[in-house]
């Protein structure tokens, strides 16, 4: 099993798909990495030689931000927005949508489960 960027890649998958198991690498990025490493995207992970795996590691380490480093950078970007108290930072802090979506209805994914408010009883 190939281990790249701290992630065990599934042996039976094609290289193009296997690389997407790494956080920060999608299909397009995986194809770009394989092109730089001169590896056929249809090759199975189990069929990659040790040299090819090392070449993939080298390309990913040199050119791409993945896994923990990417997560850290995203967290720092959000923290910066919160610290400067811009609109987006305030929305992050309140747990509301950032990009202009309506919140009177919908927005449940961002706001979480409903918090019901009890009504006063009629006399």
From Swiss-Prot:
Protein's GO biological process: translation
The UniProt record lists the keyword Cytoplasm: no
Biased composition (Basic residues): 101-123
The keyword Acetylation is annotated on this UniProt entry: no
UniProt KW keywords: Ribonucleoprotein, Ribosomal protein, RNA-binding, rRNA-binding, tRNA-binding
Record SUPFAM superfamilies: S13-like H2TH domain (SSF46946)
Pfam families associated with the record: Ribosomal_S13
UniProt family annotation: Belongs to the universal ribosomal protein uS13 family.
Name of this chain's protein: Small ribosomal subunit protein uS13
Phylogenetic placement of the source organism: Bacteria, Bacillati, Bacillota, Clostridia, Peptostreptococcales
Gene designation per UniProt: rpsM
């Amino acid at each position: 099993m190939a281990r790249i960027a701290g992630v065990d890649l599934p042996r039976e998958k094609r290289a193009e798909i296997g690389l997407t198991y790494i956080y920060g690498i999608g299909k397009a990025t995986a194809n770009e990495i394989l092109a730089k490493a001169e590896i056929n995207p249809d090759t199975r992970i189990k069929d990659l030689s040790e040299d090819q795996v090392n070449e993939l590691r080298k390309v990913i380490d040199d050119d791409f931000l993945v896994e923990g480093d990417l997560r850290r950078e995203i967290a720092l970007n959000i923290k910066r927005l919160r610290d400067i108290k811009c609109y987006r930072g305030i929305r992050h802090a309140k747990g509301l949508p950032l990009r202009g979506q309506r919140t009177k209805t919908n927005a449940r994914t961002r706001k979480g489960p409903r918090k019901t408010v009890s009504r006063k009883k009629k006399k």
